[in-house]
C-alpha cells in the first residue's frame, strides 16, 4: 500500500503498523477504507475516550447508559424516556441546509432505533459575529440555512422542536456548532438494542437506497478546516425527511413484533460502523454480500457501499425464518428491504462481492479496541493573561441595560423558533420563547418531562473545568425551575484540534468538570457525543460542552411557567450574588473582552435550590420561576417581564449597581402571591436558601429595576424586534 493512499485515509504510521499486526498482511483499499473510518476520531473517540471513562453513568432510574444509540431513563409507570444530543458541525458549515437537516435526521434515528417514538427536539446553535465586515454576511447565510434545514426535517417528520439556544461569537467565525437533541418515549419493556447474535440469523438492510453522498464523512469530521475545505460539499449527506418518516413508522410497526434480535441505524461511516458495532457488541462475526445492497447509482464499488453515509437507512439482525415477515413490513411502507448478510461465529467481518471474498477483517480490534491516544496536554498560556482582569462599570446603567437586552446573545429569537413546529403531536406544555426549560406532557402516564440545553462558551474559555460544571448545573437548574426533578444528562463536547496540547488540556478539564458536577448533582451521563477538530486555519473555537438535562414532574398540571401573569405578585431572588463577572456578557458587551476568573461551584447550594423549587411547587406556593443566567438578574427579569402581561417595580438592594449583571450560579427568580409568602419563606430557611424580595408585579405597563426605567412597549420592542433587524 503506497504512503499517499495511507495518508489520504488519515492513518498514522503507528496505526498502519497496528493494522499490519491485526491482519497479518497488507490491507487492500476496501479494508483500509473500513479501518480508517472505524478508527477515525468521529467513530473511535481515540483522543477523548480516556477522559470519558470516569463519567458517572448509573442511578436507580438509569436503564441504559452510554454505549448504545441513545440513553434511557425510567419516567414512571412502566414508561421510559430515550434521548441523546449529537453534533453535525462540520457538514453544517460546509452546506448549512443539508448539514443541519441530516443532523436532525441522524439524531431522530438514534432515538427511534431504540424502539421509542420521538416526541421532542431541541438544538444548540453557535455562529460567528454577524456584525463582522468580512464574514458577517456569510454568518447570516449560515444562520438562515441551518435554521431552514432543522425546521424542514423536523417539521416534515412531525416531531416538535420545542426549545434551544443560539449564541454568537467571533470564535465561531470559522466553525459553527450545530448540536441537535431528540427525546422519545416507549414502554420500558419494549427497548431495542444494537446487537447481532445467533449464528445463521439474517442481516437485513432497510430504508433508502445507497448513493455516493456522505462518502468519507466520518473522516472529514475528524479533521480541521482550511482553504481546501470548500471542495468538501460532496461529503455532506443529503436527507429526505419523508423517507425517514416512513422508516420510523415501519420500525415502530416492526417493534410490535418479535421478529428481530437487534437494530442499528447507519450513521457516521454508514454500513461499516453499523455492521461492526452490532457484531462487536455481541462478540459475533458477520458475512455481508455487498452486491445485494440497494444502490441509487450505477457502478458503485464495495468501498463506496461500505463507506457511503446516505441517510435514512438501518441494519437489522432478524430471527432466522422471520426475514420475509420483516421485509413485508418495510415493503408495505414503500422502503427497500433486502437480506444482505448473516451472523457467524468467526468474530470476523467477511465482505463479498458477487461471491468473491474482497475483505476479511477481525471485528473486535476495530469496534472495541481502537487505538487510544495519549495526546500531550498543557495549560493554555492565555489563562494567566486574562485571570486577573476585573470588570468595572464605565457607562450609564440604563444604556448598558438597553445594549444588553438587544444584543443577539440575549434578545428573543422568534425569527428562529417561529420556523419550528412546536405543537405537533399536541404534547407541548412549554416551548421556545417561554424561557428556561421546555416541557412535554406524557399522555400515557400523566407526568411531564422537562428538558433544557445549555452551553456558555465564554465561561468555558475562562475556566474549562468550572465552565463545564456550570453547564451541567445551569441545565439542571432550568429543569428545576419548571418544578421537575433533574434526573440525567446527555452531553455534546465541542472542542478544537486535539493535536494542540492546549486544546486537549481544555478537553480534559471540561471532562473533569462534568464528572464532578454530575456526581455531586446526581444527574448521571446516559448518552453523548464528542466533536473535535472545530478549528479553521489554526484557530480553534472556545471550549463548548453542550449539556442537556432531562427531568420529570409527576403531575404535568403543576408545570411552572417563567412569566408573571398577575399583578401584585411578590418577586424574589433566591440564592447568593457573589460578584461573578469572569466571562460575563456585560464584560463582553462593554469591554469587548472575555477575561477574568470563575469561583468554584457550590454544589450544596445548587442542590438546595433545586430541592426548594421542587418542594415549593409541590405545595403550590409558586406562580412562576426562572433560572438566573447570562446578563444576571437584570436580563433574567427583563426577559421574564417582556413575555408577561404585567409591569414591574423592583429594587435589587445591591450597594454596587453593576451587581444586577453579576452571573453567579445557583440563583433563580420566583413569583408568588402574597398569601403564600410566609409559608414560602419558612421553606427557604428549611432548605438553607437565601431569599431576597425585589418588589412586585404591577398593573402599570412599566418596567423599573433600581434606576433603570422603561415603559413596557420599549422593553418589548428591544427584546422582541431587535434580532429580526440584525439578521436581515
Swiss-Prot record:
Pathway the protein contributes to: Purine metabolism; IMP biosynthesis via de novo pathway; 5-amino-1-(5-phospho-D-ribosyl)imidazole from N(2)-formyl-N(1)-(5-phospho-D-ribosyl)glycinamide: step 1/2
Listed CDD domains: PurL_repeat1, PurL_repeat2
Active site residues of this protein: 42, 88
Binding site for Mg(2+) 1: 86, 529
Pfam family, one: AIRS_C
Catalytic activity: N(2)-formyl-N(1)-(5-phospho-beta-D-ribosyl)glycinamide + L-glutamine + ATP + H2O = 2-formamido-N(1)-(5-O-phospho-beta-D-ribosyl)acetamidine + L-glutamate + ADP + phosphate + H(+)
InterPro entries in the record: PRibForGlyAmidine_synth_PurL, PurL_linker, PurM-like_C_dom, PurM-like_C_sf, PurM-like_N, PurM-like_N_sf
Subunit note: Monomer. Part of the FGAM synthase complex composed of 1 PurL, 1 PurQ and 2 PurS subunits.
Family as reported in the entry's similarity comment: Belongs to the FGAMS family.
Protein name: Phosphoribosylformylglycinamidine synthase subunit PurL
Encoding gene, per UniProt annotation: purL
Amino acid at each position: 500500500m503506497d504512503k499517499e493512499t495511507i495518508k489520504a485515509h488519515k492513518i498514522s504510521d503507528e496505526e498502519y503498523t497496528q493494522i499490519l499486526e491485526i491482519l497479518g498482511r497488507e490491507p487492500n483499499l476496501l479494508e483500509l477504507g473500513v479501518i480508517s473510518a472505524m478508527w477515525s476520531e468521529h467513530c473511535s473517540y481515540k483522543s477523548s475516550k480516556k477522559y470519558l471513562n470516569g463519567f458517572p453513568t448509573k442511578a436507580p432510574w438509569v436503564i441504559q447508559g452510554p454505549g448504545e444509540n441513545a440513553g434511557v431513563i425510567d419516567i414512571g409507570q412502566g414508561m421510559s424516556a430515550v434521548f441523546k444530543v449529537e453534533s453535525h458541525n462540520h457538514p453544517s458549515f460546509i452546506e448549512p441546509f443539508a448539514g443541519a437537516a441530516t443532523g436532525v435526521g441522524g439524531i431522530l434515528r438514534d432515538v427511534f432505533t431504540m424502539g421509542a417514538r420521538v416526541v421532542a427536539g431541541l438544538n444548540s446553535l453557535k455562529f460567528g459575529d454577524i456584525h463582522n465586515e468580512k464574514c458577517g454576511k456569510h454568518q447570516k447565510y449560515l444562520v438562515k440555512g441551518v435554521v431552514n434545514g432543522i425546521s424542514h426535517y423536523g417539521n416534515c417528520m412531525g416531531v416538535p422542536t420545542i426549545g434551544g439556544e443560539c449564541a454568537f461569537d467571533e470564535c465561531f467565525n470559522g466553525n459553527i456548532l450545530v448540536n441537535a437533541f431528540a427525546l422519545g418515549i416507549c414502554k420500558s419493556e419494549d427497548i431495542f438494542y444494537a446487537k447481532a447474535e445467533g449464528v445463521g440469523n439474517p442481516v437485513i438492510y432497510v430504508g433508502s437506497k445507497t448513493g455516493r453522498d456522505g462518502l468519507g464523512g466520518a473522516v472529514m469530521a475528524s479533521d480541521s478546516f482550511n482553504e481546501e475545505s470548500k471542495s468538501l460539499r460532496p461529503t455532506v449527506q443529503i436527507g429526505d425527511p419523508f423517507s425517514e418518516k416512513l422508516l420510523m413508522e415501519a420500525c415502530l410497526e416492526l417493534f410490535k413484533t418479535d421478529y428481530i434480535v437487534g437494530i442499528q441505524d447507519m450513521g457516521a461511516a454508514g454500513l461499516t460502523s453499523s455492521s461492526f458495532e452490532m457484531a462487536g457488541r455481541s462478540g459475533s462475526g458477520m458475512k455481508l454480500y455487498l452486491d445485494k445492497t440497494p444502490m441509487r447509482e450505477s457502478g458503485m464499488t464495495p468501498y463506496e457501499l461500505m463507506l457511503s453515509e446516505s441517510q435514512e437507512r438501518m441494519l437489522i439482525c432478524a430471527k432466522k425464518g422471520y426475514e420475509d415477515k420483516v421485509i413485508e413490513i418495510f415493503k408495505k411502507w414503500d422502503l427497500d428491504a433486502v437480506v444482505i448478510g448473516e451472523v457467524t461465529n468467526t468474530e470476523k467481518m467477511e465482505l463479498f462481492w458477487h461471491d468473491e471474498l474482497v475483505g476479511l477483517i477481525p471485528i473486535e480490534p476495530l469496534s472495541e479496541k481502537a487505538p487510544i491516544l495519549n495526546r500531550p496536554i498543557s495549560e493554555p498560556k492565555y489563562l494567566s493573561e486574562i485571570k486577573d482582569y476585573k470588570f468595572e462599570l464605565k457607562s450609564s446603567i440604563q444604556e448598558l441595560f438597553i445594549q444588553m437586552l438587544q444584543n443577539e446573545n440575549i434578545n428573543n429569537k422568534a425569527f428562529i423558533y417561529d420556523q419550528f413546529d412546536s405543537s405537533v403531536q399536541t404534547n407541548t406544555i412549554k416551548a421556545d420563547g417561554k424561557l428556561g426549560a421546555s416541557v412535554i406532557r406524557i399522555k400515557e402516564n400523566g407526568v411531564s418531562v422537562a428538558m433544557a440545553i445549555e452551553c456558555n462558551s465564554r465561561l468555558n474559555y475562562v475556566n474549562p473545568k468550572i465552565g463545564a460544571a456550570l453547564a451541567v448545573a445551569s441545565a439542571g437548574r432550568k429543569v428545576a425551575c419548571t418544578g421537575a426533578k433533574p434526573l440525567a444528562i446527555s452531553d455534546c463536547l465541542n472542542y478544537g484540534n486535539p493535536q494542540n496540547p492546549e486544546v486537549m488540556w481544555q478537553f480534559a478539564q471540561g471532562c473533569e468538570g462534568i464528572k464532578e458536577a454530575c456526581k455531586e448533582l446526581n444527574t448521571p451521563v446516559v448518552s453523548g457525543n464528542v466533536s473535535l477538530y472545530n478549528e479553521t486555519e489554526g484557530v480553534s473555537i472556545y471550549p463548548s460542552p453542550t449539556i442537556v438535562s432531562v427531568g420529570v414532574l409527576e403531575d404535568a398540571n403543576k408545570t411552572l411557567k417563567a412569566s408573571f401573569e398577575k399583578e401584585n405578585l411578590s418577586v424574589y431572588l433566591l440564592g447568593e450574588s457573589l460578584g461573578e463577572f469572569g466571562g460575563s456578557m456585560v464584560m463582553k458587551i462593554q469591554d469587548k473582552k472575555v477575561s477574568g476568573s470563575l469561583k468554584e461551584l457550590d454544589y450544596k447550594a445548587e442542590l438546595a435550590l433545586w430541592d426548594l423549587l421542587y418542594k415549593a411547587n409541590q405545595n403550590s406556593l409558586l406562580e412562576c420561576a426562572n433560572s438566573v443566567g447570562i446578563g444576571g438578574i437584570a436580563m433574567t427579569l427583563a426577559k421574564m417581564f417582556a413575555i408577561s402581561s404585567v409591569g414591574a417595580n423592583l429594587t435589587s438592594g445591591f450597594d454596587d449597581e453593576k451587581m444586577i449583571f453579576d452571573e453567579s450560579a445557583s440563583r433563580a427568580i420566583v413569583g408568588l402571591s402574597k398569601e403564600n409568602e410566609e409559608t414560602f419563606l419558612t421553606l427557604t430557611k428549611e432548605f438553607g436558601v437565601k431569599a431576597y424580595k425585589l418588589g412586585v408585579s404591577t398593573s402599570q405597563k412599566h418596567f423599573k429595576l433600581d434606576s433603570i426605567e422603561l415603559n413596557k412597549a420599549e422593553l418589548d420592542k428591544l427584546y422582541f424586534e431587535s434580532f429580526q433587524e440584525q439578521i436581515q
